[in-house]
């Protein structure tokens, strides 16, 4: 597949072999066409995940969707689609499993007798404000449950659709129950359209952060992932733009290509930026000990070697210049009204 055959609107340019299946069919380049999204309703028995990773700052996460229409070529969550019998490639962004019973399951979780409330992260795996949310409103219904039970929630998204729920955020913020962060890995619109094709533009995300902050909502941003040779030269510019919105904090991660993310991303590079492919792959390996992936706790986010160190130093320059006196707002579970009373029963 040549660069002229890059499929617009898709991060993955093809499906890749499922690690758990013995056989697979890989189509020829000429067979691959843009695929329409298929929505699949699933019926989980539980909805809140206990986060046990020592390098993550949350104890619970909740994912209303499995798979993500945003189509980010680098997404670390792609391999999770293989557990459902799908591919981490095109399937991940075109076969979306939706959990319409998530709000009801969340209420059942809240009224457990021994539940101790702690901030729940939306989503942690796939984006809770991906395009289908505009129609289904599962995330909004989840927020309504959290407001009713006065339970704290932190949100991370790549979509300015978060503004739709500003009315709920304002009410939740009266009890210190909400924080909202947006991920902005590039200001280059051409790169964004190819790399994360169905996310909001950087301009729209920055405007959303500004509006949220004007309404006193705690906000933050992630520069994620930083990819040497693609967006690493934008870091200081992005930090400055984030600071101008009034955001309380920013964070970042370095790219890692674990498992089947690797063939998806490499094929994307080949079709989107063939002239940069070898350089980008080489730079990633230089900060990943000769590999493209990394699963070790803590190491997976910070990398190693001179390339990673240069990125870290640039980040610190930006932090000291633009975020010196800012910090993340700590949310409160002091007003939680779930397991103690069990009186609401929204469903």
What role is predicted for each listed range?
Residues 68-70, 225:
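Basic (Lys/Arg-enriched) interaction patch that binds polyanionic ligands
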């Amino acid at each position: 597949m040549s660069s002229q055959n890059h499929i617009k609107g898709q991060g993955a340019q093809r499906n890749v072999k499922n690690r758990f299946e013995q056989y697979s069919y890989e189509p020829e380049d000429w067979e691959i066409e843009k695929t329409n999204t298929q929505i699949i309703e699933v019926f989980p028995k539980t909805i809140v995940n206990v986060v046990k990773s020592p390098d993550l700052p949350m104890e619970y996460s909740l994912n209303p969707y499995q798979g993500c229409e945003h189509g980010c070529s680098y997404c670390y969550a792609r391999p999770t689609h293989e557990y459902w019998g799908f591919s981490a490639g095109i399937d991940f962004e075109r076969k979306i499993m939706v959990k319409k019973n998530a709000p009801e399951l969340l209420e059942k979780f809240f009224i457990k007798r021994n539940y101790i409330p702690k901030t729940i992260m939306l989503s942690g795996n796939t984006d809770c404000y991906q395009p289908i949310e505009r129609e289904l409103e599962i995330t909004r219904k989840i927020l309504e449950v959290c407001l009713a039970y006065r339970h704290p929630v932190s949100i991370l998204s790549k979509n300015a659709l978060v503004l739709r729920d500003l009315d709920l955020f304002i009410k939740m913020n009266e009890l210190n129950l909400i924080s909202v962060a947006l991920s902005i890995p590039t200001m280059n619109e051409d790169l964004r359209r190819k790399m994360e094709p169905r996310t909001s533009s950087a301009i729209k995300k920055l405007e959303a952060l500004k509006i949220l902050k004007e309404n006193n909502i705690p906000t933050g941003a992630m520069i994620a992932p930083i990819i040497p040779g693609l967006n690493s030269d934008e870091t200081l510019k992005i930090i400055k733009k984030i600071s101008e919105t009034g955001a309380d904090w920013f964070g970042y991660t370095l790219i890692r290509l674990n498992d089947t993310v690797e063939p998806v991303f490499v094929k994307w590079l080949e079709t989107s930026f063939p002239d940069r492919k070898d350089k980008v792959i080489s730079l990633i390996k230089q900060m990943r000990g000769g590999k493209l992936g990394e699963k070790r706790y803590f190491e997976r986010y910070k990398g190693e070697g001179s390339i990673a160190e240069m990125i870290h130093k640039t980040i610190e320059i930006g932090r000291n210049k633009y975020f010196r006196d800012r910090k993340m707002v700590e949310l409160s579970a002091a007003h939680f009204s779930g397991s103690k009373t069990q009186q609401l029963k929204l469903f």
